[in-house]
């Protein structure tokens, strides 16, 4: 099994055009050093992948959070598709080992350079879209990105506690309290449960990997309750 067969097995998709897959992992420095091979770099695929990623993530957020304001969805999407997040996704599936670099870029540490890794993730999305279609891109993101959204990893970019405070205090002063109800799971993978109480009435409960995430989740539930009355 060569490295490209290994990569396809790793991501769970077969490419009809393996050259397109190779291009997604080809840095311009490699092209400059292999001009006789007529290879193409990944910059155009990165351009396309960036747009496909924004569309698919936007669609997921739009459907998952039907009551979230546009501004908050924008902030959340920005946190998901920012360079540090893309690097995390690329590292999780060991993309760096497949990147084709020029010797100079390799010596300069390009294989672990964050911007380069983020670009490769986007160019792979572009190649996957061209070769397999948008549905397969969504299937891939359902394994790599969407579970992190579901787990609340990006909720800190959306301050539901502030939103809730603004909603309930529009007409009167109220007392908002948050209680941590308990925790479950082993030390390395804890989950916390929280509730939000407004003027003595429990309005929402939620859970999260941290106490802050649990409180944010409870506030989000309370907002949903209030806006659907």
Curated annotation (Swiss-Prot):
Annotated compartments: Cytoplasm
Cofactor(s) listed: Mg(2+)
Major localization listed first in the record, in broad terms: cytoplasm
Location of the RNase III domain: 4-133
Enzyme class: hydrolase
Gene Ontology cellular-component terms listed: cytoplasm
Active-site residues per Swiss-Prot or TrEMBL entry: 50, 122
Pfam families attached to this UniProt entry: dsrm, Ribonucleas_3_3
GO molecular function list: double-stranded RNA binding; metal ion binding; ribonuclease III activity; rRNA binding
InterPro entries xref list: dsRBD_dom, RNase_III, RNase_III_dom, RNase_III_sf
SUPFAM superfamilies according to UniProt: dsRNA-binding domain-like (SSF54768), RNase III domain-like (SSF69065)
Occurrences of domain DRBM (ranges): 159-228
Catalyzed reaction equations: Endonucleolytic cleavage to 5'-phosphomonoester
Entry EC number(s): 3.1.26.3
PROSITE patterns membership: DS_RBD (PS50137), RNASE_3_1 (PS00517), RNASE_3_2 (PS50142)
Binding-site list for Mg(2+): 46, 119, 122
GO annotation terms (biological process): mRNA processing; regulation of gene expression; rRNA processing; tRNA processing
Keywords in alphabetical order: Cytoplasm, Endonuclease, Hydrolase, Magnesium, Metal-binding, mRNA processing, Nuclease, RNA-binding, rRNA processing, rRNA-binding, tRNA processing
Family classification: Belongs to the ribonuclease III family.
PANTHER family, per the entry: RIBONUCLEASE 3 (PTHR11207:SF0), RIBONUCLEASE III (PTHR11207)
The protein's role, per its UniProt record: Digests double-stranded RNA. Involved in the processing of primary rRNA transcript to yield the immediate precursors to the large and small rRNAs (23S and 16S). Processes some mRNAs, and tRNAs when they are encoded in the rRNA operon. Processes pre-crRNA and tracrRNA of type II CRISPR loci if present in the organism.
Subunit structure as annotated in this protein's UniProt entry: Homodimer.
Name assigned to this protein: Ribonuclease 3
Organism: Listeria welshimeri serovar 6b (strain ATCC 35897 / DSM 20650 / CCUG 15529 / CIP 8149 / NCTC 11857 / SLCC 5334 / V8)
